[in-house]
Regions:
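Acidic, low-complexity, intrinsically disordered interaction modules
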Residues: 24-109
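Intrinsically disordered/linker segments and immediately adjacent domain-edge residues
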Residues: 111-113
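Negatively charged, low-complexity tracts enriched in Asp/Glu with abundant Ser/Thr
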Residues: 2-36
Protein backbone atom coordinates (compact mmCIF):
# COMPACT_ATOMS: atom_id res chain seq x y z
CA UNK A 1 0.00 0.00 0.00
CA UNK A 2 1.23 3.51 -0.83
CA UNK A 3 0.90 6.51 1.44
CA UNK A 4 0.63 9.82 -0.39
CA UNK A 5 1.56 13.09 1.26
CA UNK A 6 1.50 16.35 -0.66
CA UNK A 7 4.67 18.36 0.03
CA UNK A 8 5.64 21.96 -0.49
CA UNK A 9 9.06 22.79 -1.90
CA UNK A 10 10.26 23.42 1.67
CA UNK A 11 9.07 19.97 2.78
CA UNK A 12 10.72 18.21 -0.16
CA UNK A 13 14.00 20.12 0.29
CA UNK A 14 14.10 19.26 4.00
CA UNK A 15 13.28 15.61 3.29
CA UNK A 16 16.16 15.41 0.81
CA UNK A 17 18.59 17.09 3.24
CA UNK A 18 17.57 14.86 6.15
CA UNK A 19 17.21 11.52 4.37
CA UNK A 20 18.98 11.24 1.01
CA UNK A 21 22.37 9.51 1.12
CA UNK A 22 24.65 8.70 -1.79
CA UNK A 23 23.29 5.68 -3.63
CA UNK A 24 19.77 6.12 -2.24
CA UNK A 25 16.77 6.83 -4.41
CA UNK A 26 13.66 8.75 -3.45
CA UNK A 27 10.66 7.75 -5.52
CA UNK A 28 7.80 10.19 -5.86
CA UNK A 29 4.73 10.63 -7.99
CA UNK A 30 3.08 13.65 -9.50
CA UNK A 31 -0.53 14.17 -10.34
CA UNK A 32 0.52 16.42 -13.22
CA UNK A 33 -1.72 14.67 -15.72
CA UNK A 34 -5.02 15.41 -17.33
CA UNK A 35 -6.42 12.08 -16.13
CA UNK A 36 -7.74 12.12 -12.59
CA UNK A 37 -6.17 9.51 -10.32
CA UNK A 38 -3.27 8.84 -12.71
CA UNK A 39 0.22 9.43 -11.34
CA UNK A 40 3.55 9.71 -13.15
CA UNK A 41 6.49 8.19 -11.28
CA UNK A 42 9.87 9.86 -10.99
CA UNK A 43 12.99 9.61 -8.84
CA UNK A 44 15.51 11.74 -6.98
CA UNK A 45 19.02 10.29 -6.61
CA UNK A 46 22.52 11.43 -5.65
CA UNK A 47 25.05 10.49 -8.32
CA UNK A 48 28.84 10.83 -8.37
CA UNK A 49 31.04 11.31 -11.41
CA UNK A 50 34.21 9.49 -10.27
CA UNK A 51 36.57 11.15 -12.76
CA UNK A 52 35.86 14.52 -11.19
CA UNK A 53 34.78 13.43 -7.70
CA UNK A 54 31.70 15.56 -8.30
CA UNK A 55 28.33 14.83 -6.74
CA UNK A 56 24.94 15.89 -8.01
CA UNK A 57 21.33 15.35 -7.09
CA UNK A 58 19.45 14.26 -10.20
CA UNK A 59 15.68 14.62 -10.39
CA UNK A 60 13.91 12.78 -13.19
CA UNK A 61 10.82 14.79 -14.07
CA UNK A 62 8.23 15.63 -16.67
CA UNK A 63 8.39 12.30 -18.44
CA UNK A 64 11.65 10.40 -19.02
CA UNK A 65 14.49 11.99 -20.92
CA UNK A 66 14.66 15.16 -18.83
CA UNK A 67 16.49 15.70 -15.57
CA UNK A 68 16.91 18.54 -13.13
CA UNK A 69 20.40 18.65 -11.59
CA UNK A 70 21.58 20.16 -8.29
CA UNK A 71 25.38 20.44 -7.86
CA UNK A 72 26.79 19.43 -4.46
CA UNK A 73 30.03 20.08 -2.58
CA UNK A 74 32.78 17.86 -4.02
CA UNK A 75 34.63 17.32 -0.76
CA UNK A 76 32.03 15.82 1.53
CA UNK A 77 29.83 12.73 1.70
CA UNK A 78 27.34 14.65 3.83
CA UNK A 79 25.36 17.80 3.12
CA UNK A 80 27.35 20.82 4.26
CA UNK A 81 25.72 24.24 4.73
CA UNK A 82 26.36 25.24 1.10
CA UNK A 83 24.73 22.01 -0.09
CA UNK A 84 21.69 22.66 2.08
CA UNK A 85 21.36 26.15 0.62
CA UNK A 86 21.73 24.77 -2.93
CA UNK A 87 19.10 22.11 -2.33
CA UNK A 88 16.61 24.64 -0.97
CA UNK A 89 17.25 27.09 -3.81
CA UNK A 90 17.10 24.49 -6.58
CA UNK A 91 14.01 22.71 -5.23
CA UNK A 92 12.22 26.05 -5.03
CA UNK A 93 13.21 26.70 -8.67
CA UNK A 94 12.16 23.15 -9.62
CA UNK A 95 8.66 23.80 -8.29
CA UNK A 96 8.53 27.08 -10.24
CA UNK A 97 9.64 25.23 -13.38
CA UNK A 98 6.87 22.66 -12.97
CA UNK A 99 4.32 25.43 -12.42
CA UNK A 100 5.55 27.23 -15.55
CA UNK A 101 4.92 24.06 -17.53
CA UNK A 102 1.27 24.27 -16.51
CA UNK A 103 1.38 21.96 -13.53
CA UNK A 104 -0.74 23.18 -10.68
CA UNK A 105 0.60 21.59 -7.55
CA UNK A 106 3.61 20.23 -5.73
CA UNK A 107 4.99 16.75 -6.34
CA UNK A 108 3.31 14.05 -4.30
CA UNK A 109 5.76 12.28 -2.04
CA UNK A 110 5.23 8.54 -1.98
CA UNK A 111 6.31 6.19 0.79
CA UNK A 112 6.01 2.43 1.11
CA UNK A 113 4.03 1.21 4.10
CA UNK A 114 6.05 -1.37 6.04
Amino acid sequence: MKIYEKMSWVGLANYIINNLKEGDTIEFATDYTEWEGYHCWYFIRIVRIPEYQSRFIVIDYCGGGEAYVIPLNNYSHEFDEDDKDYVREYIKDYFKLCNNLGFEDAPVWVEEEV
